[in-house]
Amino acid sequence: MDWQTLLTRERLGKPVHSNDELGRSAFHKDHDRIIFSGAFRRLGRKTQVHPVSSNDHIHTRLTHSLEVACVGRSLGMRVGEILREELPEWCDPSDLGVIVQSACLAHDIGNPPFGHSGEDAIRNWFQQAAGRGWLDEMSDAERSDFLHFEGNAQGFRVLTQLEYHQFDGGTRLTYATLGTYLKYPWTSRHAEALGYKKHKFGCYQSELPLLEQITHKLGMPQLDDERWARHPLVYLMEAADDICYGLIDLEDGLEMELLEYSEVEALLLGLVGDDLPDTYRQLGPRDSRRRKLAILRGKAIEHLTNAAARAFVDQQQALLAGQLAGDLVEHMHGPAKLCVQRAKAIAREKIFQDKRKTLHEIGAYTTLEILLNAFCGAALEQYGGHTPSFKNRRILDLLGRNAPDPQWPLYRAFLQVIDFIAGMTDSYATEMAREMTGRSSPS
């Protein structure tokens, strides 16, 4: 792979580059299109790790995505400065920052309500549906898309099909930004076989032609049937997510009183060492722990982004060859690598086992089961031109103009249902499921 091809300004669905808006590069337009999309806006009411809370300090998918985007922009610009002489003439270091920033903004845009438990609930429902014979008419590859449902693949569909220009390029982002978004540029056929991260894949069968087009335009080498090497900038987006995920889990753990401040402080001090800002040294006993943590967190992120940028540059040859094993965190050195690994371990041990989170996950299964039974059941009943019952006609009416056509293959019809349900916020999904079961909202 080479930077000249990897950083093309050409857009999906719009082959000719235009300069019709002064003051914004093609990559800035990508950023703005994601920010103004409805799918991005709805992240504000979707679970990150903990249930959407009355405590405004707890992260949602939206605040997490914004923070990841800030770190991603810094990473892209730092790498861009180092690689300045290797960039194409139309691209400067700030463009790399914007490309990575845009991909970071969109990295969770396809996640369903209720976070990772929502993904698992959808997979579980389709496994039961397969046992009932509901997926029998699909190909093995199509069936696999539902059995391994993945927010990354749904996000790729949102960006390339659903937002703005429906089924005509979607948001029409540049190939460079789409490549940087594609964390897993392969289909569900490889979700289990690769062993990289269980269940992970980035493209449904319905978007496979688009994946082929994007990887061809970017010069991403094909490694196997329906599997390609990753775009190098994906590793910066992934590192930004890992950095923020590790730190914000600890912050949320403090807010929910699942961790002691001294434990988090010790972890971050172990990373930054003596490189403490004067503002931190001047803090007194009357300063809040939130203020202390904010200052310490800022310095910690600086150290982690520096370490990730160094790892990227050190591994550039392997990255451009599509041969880097693992992620950038694995190639970081010293305190930075240990800090991220320890932060994730603390989250697993002390935060993810919280009873409130467990109850929320159980509720997610119930809510999504109600919705999937209703909408997929209605789509199945009308399949092949059959007349649905009055109840199922009314259920399909809720989908409006996005209701599946009776003559569509079941694969396409069920995807349309998933588009609707995965796009819901936690509160909207909960309220709709409650109303479908005849229960009124709590007063």
UniProtKB/Swiss-Prot annotation:
Please, one GO biological process term? Answer: dGTP catabolic process
Q: Name one Pfam family in it.
A: HD
- Asked whether the UniProt record includes Hydrolase among its keywords, one would answer yes
Query: Boundaries of each HD domain copy?
Result: 61-246
Report a single Gene Ontology molecular function. dGTPase activity
Source superkingdom: Bacteria
What SMART domains would the database entry show? Answer: HDc (SM00471)
Key words of the record: Hydrolase
TM region positions: none
The record's comment on protein family reads: Belongs to the dGTPase family. Type 3 subfamily.
Protein name in UniProt: Deoxyguanosinetriphosphate triphosphohydrolase-like protein
Gene assigned in the entry: dgt2
